Each structure stands twice: as structure tokens, then as C-alpha cells.
Amino acid sequence: MSDLQESLEKLSINEKAPQAPADDATPSNTTTLEKESSESAAAAAGEGAGEEGEEASASLYVGELNPSVNEALLFEIFSPIGQVSSIRVCRDAVTKKSLGYAYVNFHKHADGSRAIEELNYSLVDGRPCRIMWSQRDPSLRRNGDGNIFIKNLHPAIDNKALHDTFSAFGRILSCKVATDELGQSKCFGFVHYETAEAAEAAIENVNGMLLNDREVFVGKHVSKRDRESKFEEMKANFTNVYVKNLAPEVDNAKFEEIFKPFGPVTSVHLETDQEGKSRGFGFVNFENHESALNAVKEMNDKEIDGQKLYVGRAQKKRERLDELKRLYESTRLEKLSKYQGVNLFVKNLDDSIDSEKLEEEFKPFGTITSARVMVDDAGKSKGFGFVCFSSPEEATKAITEMNQRMIQGKPLYVALAQRKDVRRSQLEQQIQARNQMRMQNAAAAAGMPGQFMSPMFYGQQPGFFPPNGRGGAQGPFPPNPQMMMPRGGQMPPPQGQWPRAGPNGQPVPVYGMPPVYGGEFNGPNGQRQQRGAYPPNRNQKGGRPQRDLAAIISTVPVDQQKRILGEELYPKIVATGKAQEPEAAGKITGMMLDLENEEILALLEDDELFENHFEDALTAFEEYKKGEQAE
């Protein structure tokens, strides 16, 4: 017992204090941590299964990790302990971001034990990690016999301090202090022991003692289901009453006198400020439920000292917040249903248009219940507003007549008003659809089945084979002749029937195929030459100007327009130097060809616009390659 006393004194447990009330053993705000605690317990402490179970498992759960921690960093930390068989950082299935915990598997159980002893609560990328035995048996994880709850902890007490305090009573499977979004302690936590006896010893010795000058309460952990069932029972048999709108001159003595006629009062509490003045509300706790119920019935809305009192069942803070949220949500839905189909959103308003002018413009279409132009803090118009009609028919008529109408030299945009969350959801769906289309294009360019991809080949020109400097053929067929077929279905000439070279080393198109030019060819002196997508004008050295490209596109069949645009895009993509992989340029070209022809023409003329679309396509290609490598 001397060892136990010494251990407790190290953590400032100074003296025994009065026992905390049993009915307040577990607060309602432990729900968040309970989920975390169950996750910890889910990963925790296989060592509780006995020596035989321990020898069969050498898997550790490592929690509280920084999102930047990866498998390589964990291997550097754990490999000096012993031979590591595998490491897995758990990630979100969609975003692939770390969930903040990982599993480390050793070949030997002894190495796992040593890792817990030496590395538990050590800093990993600036955060103290929690290491426990992984327990994959759900029946053992959910066993709460050895689980205790501690509240009123000092904010300075972290996971390690809590572990050091309670490890004196037995073997700990998991230990955690609840924290908020900023990592600050919520002043309560959980300790899960291997045995129920160790938990009982901790409750007996630490409950009601001072830890860092704070009296702590330690009790058995009660599951959420049990708490809720108990809470419903407490609500039906409440004894604690909340009173507000009290006059400033009401003190504790007068407060008690007001409620004594309804039954025996066990305690009263009047809330005061720092100066000791009443804050106008307090609590009265009766000995039995009947007295509390009578007080609520008789005193609610009764006037005392010129103030109409509110008297009702005392609620926990969380319960009250939930009730307010439900009330707010019902009010919001009622308001939305009331204005569904009658409230219009109007934008592109001139700065001179105010709410009165807006109402005048829309008044001919029906009865307006409200019209408002939104303004900033300085009172200047934001360029948009809302008009609410009395019926959906009037609103529909206003949309038909006023949308795109010129007002003060600006065309109005008029549509049904949407909630912010609906607009955000629609935008997210559009972005998701666009990203999905890009990924489909990348997959199609990679030749995955089930995806349609226009047959094109970017490396040699479809429709002919490049002649050498002497006018003969050079090199074998391309690796995939089908990729060279035009959509019209013409086949390249059989092997051995090579087209001869034309004047100036220009290739002669294969019979029946459109004369599409471009790609790299051998010139008269055997040099590589880059040509445009169209035959160059004899009177000029370069290819056609981009401004003529749209006119030329309009003269060719629809099924060949993408091919021609692709021959323009491909050399431009290659020229960026960013498509490093052999097949990258061709696949990115295929992705960018998914745009409308007008957009592609704009890309070819605007380098900045081209760069933006190229970067998006390159990113999609790189993500696809990473996913392919992972598979």
C-alpha cells in the first residue's frame, strides 16, 4: 500500500475529500469520447485475453497520430524495437486522408510488449502517440467490466498523466482523456482495465480524492444505451426544478421560502455573478417528484415581485441545446415551405436600383409580399436581391417576363430562390460529375474496357506512313494499327504496300483517307520535322493561323473534327515538357478533347487558358496512375 500511496502523491493526490453524488456519475457530454473510447477499445489491449492469446497476436494499435504520419515514418520508429512484419495507416476510403491511427504488426509478441513500454506516449511528428494491443474480438472490446469513468480532471492532465496515475491499480488496456476540436482537455476521461478487480480498486482509492488540487469523481463507465434509458426514467420522475425571471432582490432564503409550501426542499441554488448579485435564475431540488410537479404546475407563469416566473423541469445543457435545435429546425422548415415557389432571386442589378425600385419593376406581375435589395455594411447595393410573391403562379409569370430583361442597361437574372445548402449541393454534384468525367477519360485513354474512346493515335499520323529521305518506307507498322483508323472505317494499306513520298518529302495520303497532316516526319534530308494539323499554305512558311481553324473545322465531317483538333493539341502538350511519361501526352490529349470544340479552339488561342486545362488534365492523369500502381 505504501507503493500505491507514493504513486498517487507524485500526481498531487493530497487528501480524501467527500464523495461525489452518485446520480451525477456520468455526464451526458461523454458521447463524443465514448465513440473514441470504443474505437480505442476496439483496437486496444489484446493482452487482456491471457498469455495464450497474447502469444497468438503481436499487433499494436497506434493512435493520436498526426495526419501527416505515414507508414515509412512509423517503420523508422518501430523497426529498432524488433522485426516489423507490416504497418498500415488507416485512411478515409474517399479522400485517402489519414484517420489518425495505425496498426503495427511485429513477428514476436515480446517486441510488441517492448514497443508499448518504450514508445507509448512518445512524440511522433510533434504529437504524443497512444500504443495498445490490438483487440479484434468485438465481444472483448465491448466488455465494460473493467472500464471506469473519471471527471473533473485538471486541464493539464493528459493521456500519459492519467495512465501513470491509474496504472498503480492494475494492467491498463486503454486510457484516454477527452479533447475538443482544438485538442484542449474536456476534463474527463476513461481508463479500461484488464480486470474488474483493478477497476474496483481504482474507484475505491481515487474517487473523491484531490488530483492537481481538483476533487475527481471516479466511477464505473455507463454505456450510452444505459444512460439514455436511465435518463428517460429520471425525466419522468424529476425532482430538480429550474426557475428564471427572478427579481434582483430575491436571495437564497427568500427563494427557498417561495417554494417550501409545495413540499420538502433538499437544496436551493441561486446563480450569482462575480460581484455576488443574482443573475435572475436558480434551481430548487425537492425530496420527491410529486412536490416538484406541483411546484411547476402552480408557479409557472406566476407573478412574483412584478416578474412573471418561468418554472420547469431542470434540463442538462445538452438536452436544452438539442431542444433548441429541434425548435429552430422546425421553424426553418415551416418558413421554407411557406415561401416555396414564390420567392425569387434577382441578380445583375444596377447599383442605382434600391428595394422600392425593385418592387416597382415586379409589381405588374402580382401581389408582392416583400422585396429587398441586399446591401453591404456601407449601404451600397450588392447587385442582387429577392422578390416574394403571394402565389407560385405570379412568381412563374415574373420569371418568364423578367429574366434577361434589360433594366438600367443590364440584363436581369431571375430565378426561384434556393437555400444555400441546396446551391452548395448542386455545385458539389457538378464538380463531382466533372471530375468523374475526367477520370473516365483518363481510364479510356489507358485502354480500360467499358469506356468509349475515339480512335486516334498521337505519335504517327493516321491515314499514311512516313516516308524516309529517299521516298521509301521506314520502320515497321505502329504498335496498334487499329488506333490509326479514321472513324469512317477506312483501313490502312496492307503491309508492304507503302505510299510513295510526294514532292518536298510530303507523304501522299492513302487512297480513301482524308489528307490529315501533322506529327513528326522525316524530311528530304532525313531530318525530323514537326508539321501542323493541316497542309501548309504554299505561300507561307508556317501552318494556318488559329483564327482560320474554326472555319476549316466547320467544313469537315463531324466525326473528323476531334481528330483535327487533337493534331493541334498534341504538339502543344508535348511542348510543355510536363508530360514526362511516354503515353502521357496522348492520354492528356484525349482528356482535353472531351471539351466542346469551341472550348478547344479557345485553348489553342489563349495560352493561359490552355495551361489551366492542361494542369487539370495532368493532375487527373497522375492520380489515375497512382491508383493503378496501388492496385
Curated annotation (Swiss-Prot):
Keyword Repeat: yes
Disulfide bridges in this chain: none
Cross-referenced SUPFAM superfamilies: PABC (PABP) domain, RNA-binding domain, RBD
Matching Pfam families: MLLE (PF00658), RRM_1 (PF00076)
Residue ranges of domain RRM in the record: 58-136, 146-223, 239-316, 342-419
NCBIfam families: PABP-1234
Protein name (Swiss-Prot/TrEMBL): Polyadenylate-binding protein, cytoplasmic and nuclear
Organism: Meyerozyma guilliermondii (strain ATCC 6260 / CBS 566 / DSM 6381 / JCM 1539 / NBRC 10279 / NRRL Y-324)
Designated gene of the protein: PAB1
